[in-house]
């Protein structure tokens, strides 16, 4: 949904845990030889509905991860999490990657692969069914997953936007 503001400002009272999604060694060839550097995709979350992602590039792996964490802390968004799952089905596309996220019953676990799993676990979702289609590029998968999560709305948010009670959302 365009125009919806669910961004979160980073403060010291939010305790964020970081997860490394992917690391890539990049080689620049010059006439003097090869120069190696590293890029790292990092996801940070508080496991209570706040998530962010970042990309760090540096000459050393640890420096790239640290830059990625700092970048992720600047891109935080709030996501509705209901009883350990998502409120409704949602799909999103970024580049060639398309993701489908569906709520699951308690005890199912996180049924998702690779980059999607890191994002879903960092946001605090414990039961979900997720599928990726198209590109398996971790950059695009992370962005598409966060896009799908940030488009989700729970009943309270819908009622607030419409100016009605939560009961009226379900009864019509």
Curated annotation (Swiss-Prot):
SUPFAM superfamilies, per database record: dsRNA-binding domain-like, Ribosomal protein S5 domain 2-like
PROSITE patterns linked to this entry: RIBOSOMAL_S5, S5_DSRBD
Assembly with partners or alone: Part of the 30S ribosomal subunit. Contacts proteins S4 and S8.
InterPro entries, per database record: Ribosomal_Su5_D2-typ_SF (IPR020568), Ribosomal_uS5 (IPR000851), Ribosomal_uS5_bac-type (IPR005712), Ribosomal_uS5_C (IPR005324), Ribosomal_uS5_N (IPR013810), Ribosomal_uS5_N_CS (IPR018192), Ribsml_uS5_D2-typ_fold_subgr (IPR014721)
PANTHER family in the cross-refs: MITOCHONDRIAL RIBOSOMAL PROTEIN S5
Naturally occurring in which organism (per UniProt): Bacteroides thetaiotaomicron (strain ATCC 29148 / DSM 2079 / JCM 5827 / CCUG 10774 / NCTC 10582 / VPI-5482 / E50)
GO cellular component: cytosolic small ribosomal subunit
Disulfide bridge map: none
Record family assignment: Belongs to the universal ribosomal protein uS5 family.
Domain topic, free-text comment: The N-terminal domain interacts with the head of the 30S subunit; the C-terminal domain interacts with the body and contacts protein S4. The interaction surface between S4 and S5 is involved in control of translational fidelity.
Gene Ontology biological-process annotations: translation
Keywords for this protein: Ribonucleoprotein, Ribosomal protein, RNA-binding, rRNA-binding
GO molecular function per UniProt: rRNA binding; structural constituent of ribosome
Domain of life of the source: Bacteria
Residues covered by the S5 DRBM domain: 16-79
Pfam families for the chain: Ribosomal_S5, Ribosomal_S5_C
The protein's role, per its UniProt record: With S4 and S12 plays an important role in translational accuracy.
Protein name, UniProt field: Small ribosomal subunit protein uS5
């Amino acid at each position: 949904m365009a125009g919806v503001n669910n961004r979160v400002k980073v403060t010291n009272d939010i305790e964020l845990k970081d997860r490394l999604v992917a690391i890539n060694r990049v080689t620049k060839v010059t006439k003097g030889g090869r120069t190696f550097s590293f890029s790292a995709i990092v996801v940070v979350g508080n496991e209570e509905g706040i998530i962010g992602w970042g990309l760090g590039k540096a000459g050393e792996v640890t420096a790239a991860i640290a830059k990625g964490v700092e970048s992720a802390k600047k891109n935080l968004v709030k996501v509705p999490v209901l009883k350990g799952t998502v409120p409704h089905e949602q799909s999103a596309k970024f580049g060639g990657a398309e993701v489908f996220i569906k709520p699951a019953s308690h005890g199912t676990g996180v049924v998702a692969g690779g980059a999607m799993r890191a994002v879903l676990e960092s946001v605090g979702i414990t039961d979900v069914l997720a599928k990726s289609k198209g590109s398996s590029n971790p950059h695009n998968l992370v962005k598409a997953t966060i896009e799908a999560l940030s488009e989700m709305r729970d009943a309270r948010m819908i009622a607030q936007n419409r100016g009605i009670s939560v009961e009226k959302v379900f009864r019509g």
